[in-house]
Design a protein with these regions (language model features):
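Hydrophobic, lipid-facing positions within transmembrane beta-strands of outer-membrane proteins
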Residues: 100-102, 152, 166-170, 180-184, ...
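Acidic, small-polar-rich N-terminal luminal/periplasmic segments of exported/outer-membrane proteins
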Residues: 13-15, 29-165
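Acidic/polar loop-and-plug regions of large Gram-negative outer-membrane beta-barrel proteins
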Residues: 202-206, 219-223, 230-293, 308-342, ...
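Outer-envelope beta-barrel architecture signal
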Residues: 164-168, 180, 191-195, 227-231, ...
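Cleavable N-terminal targeting peptides that direct proteins into the secretory/outer-membrane pathway or into
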Residues: 1-27
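Outer-membrane beta-barrel translocator/receptor signature
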Residues: 129-132, 143-220, 226-230
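Residue-level signature of outer-membrane beta-barrel architecture
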Residues: 188, 222-226, 292, 353-356, ...
């Protein structure tokens, strides 16, 4: 009986499907409907950094990754480390807990950073509160960006004042570690002029008990249009003060639960001196840019930057891997202070000339840049002996405890301090 019911069901099913097959065959003469489309997502079409002219990315002979303002907002990008997480061929380094450090196609750098196409080579942690988009150029490009750029450059494009729009935007966030962040972006249209103010404050805390700090910045910008000329003037103040935490060192094979890699079980151990490890940065930056339409085919653009930077970095750090025995592990530590004072002057001018020869259109670029930089950098080494200033006394092997017990440290500045660095440099560069 069961066999009969199953067979009947199959027959009914086949019978029911017969007309459908016939209908499908009858519909073969119906007009075809084709739907096409694409999702832009974060796609951008043109770049200005690669050639200093608005050029389609497909026409730029270099690999370029563009992070748009929408992507920065959606992914809450607040640091270079956040940024490069989504960019192939680029990775972030630790930066000794006091600066941005990236590897671009195998080339490690702390200096190949630019703002609006102007060099930004001071060592600090960059924020993105006033950044409209970021263009990452991979591969050597000294012809466009000048010195450096062996593996590529990271160029941040700042937000400009908008003459025909009022904008009010604020962001607030906090996390379970106790850190919090707030930013504001206000643009006020004033006829043919505009005022834009960006600012942020961030209280720094994370899973490491010894780490804390704060950073904040403000960037007012005013723009005005006078006939065929647009001018923009901006000032930025940046302050960053934090504990210099260089993380967890590695351990030799056969020690600390047998890793030949990062030591295990020291998630909260601070491998430094809590009342000494500190990074403090302050910057005053003045920017000016203009664009003049001289004729239908000629456009003249200028940019200028003045920056005054002051940074101090003090740290005790793990100079060796963890050694000793499982019962009595040890680690070698060293210390130094690294103050830097720098003043930077940059002036840049470009003339764009559009011409035609027959059916071909050309865009010619004539430009030049003048750079001046006065810098004073010193490395003051720490010694674990008040009388014998030798390389042997620059390192001390201590027991691995939590907290780490650091012996008294003596800092000596000048030629008597073995292996110290005291560099004063003045750079004047003209390129065209």
């Amino acid at each position: 009986m069961k066999l009969y019911q199953i067979s009947a069901a199959l027959v009914i099913s086949l019978a029911a499907s017969g007309p459908a097959l016939a209908d499908d065959a009858a519909d073969t003469d119906a007009p075809a409907i084709i739907v096409t489309g694409h999702m832009d997502g974060y796609r951008t079409v043109e770049t200005n950094s690669g050639t200093k002219t608005n050029t389609p990315i497909l026409d730029v002979p270099q690999s370029i990754s563009v992070v748009t303002s929408q992507q920065i907002a959606d992914q809450q990008v607040r640091s270079v480390a956040d940024l490069v997480r989504y960019i192939p061929g680029v990775s972030a380094g630790q930066g000794e807990g006091n600066r941005d450090q990236v590897t671009l196609r195998g080339n490690n750098t702390t200096a190949d950073f630019f703002v609006d196409g102007l060099r930004d080579d001071v060592q600090y942690f960059r924020s993105f509160y006033n950044i409209d988009r970021v263009e990452v150029h991979k591969g050597a490009n000294a012809m466009v960006f000048g010195r450096g750029g062996g593996g590529g450059v990271i160029n941040r494009i700042t937000k400009g004042a908008i003459a025909d729009q009022n904008l009010y935007e604020a962001t607030v966030s906090l996390d379970t570690f106790g850190s919090y962040y707030g930013s504001a972006d206000v643009n006020i249209a004033l006829g043919s002029a505009a005022l834009r103010v960006n600012g942020f404050y961030e209280d720094l805390n994370n899973h490491r008990d010894a780490f804390s700090g704060e950073r904040y910045a403000v960037n007012p910008t005013v723009a005005a249009e006078l006939g065929n000329t647009r001018m923009e003037l901006g000032y930025e103040y940046v302050r960053d003060s934090r504990v210099a935490d260089r993380g967890i060192p590695s351990a030799f094979a056969g020690t600390i639960a047998d890793p030949a890699g990062p030591a295990r079980g020291f998630r909260d151990t601070f491998f430094g001196k809590r009342d000494f490890n500190d990074s403090d940065f302050e910057a005053h930056v003045l920017r000016f840019r203009s664009e003049s339409r001289l004729s239908e085919n000629l456009t003249f653009k200028t940019q200028a930057l003045y920056g005054d930077y002051d940074k101090s970095y003090s740290n005790v750090f793990a100079a060796t891997a963890i050694g000793g025995t499982a019962a009595a592990p040890t680690i070698g530590i060293e210390a130094y202070i690294d103050p830097t004072k720098r003043q930077t002057y940059i002036g840049q001018a470009n003339l764009e000339w559009r011409i035609s020869t027959g059916s071909f259109e050309h865009l010619l670029l004539f430009g030049g840049e003048i750079t001046g930089q006065n810098s004073r950098n010193e490395r003051i080494n720490g010694f674990f002996s008040p009388t014998v200033l030798s390389s042997a006394n620059r390192r001390s092997t201590v027991a691995l405890t939590d907290p780490l017990i650091v012996p008294p440290i003596f800092f000596v500045s000048g030629p008597t301090g073995n292996s110290n660095r005291n560099v004063r440099s003045n750079l004047d560069q003209v390129s065209a």
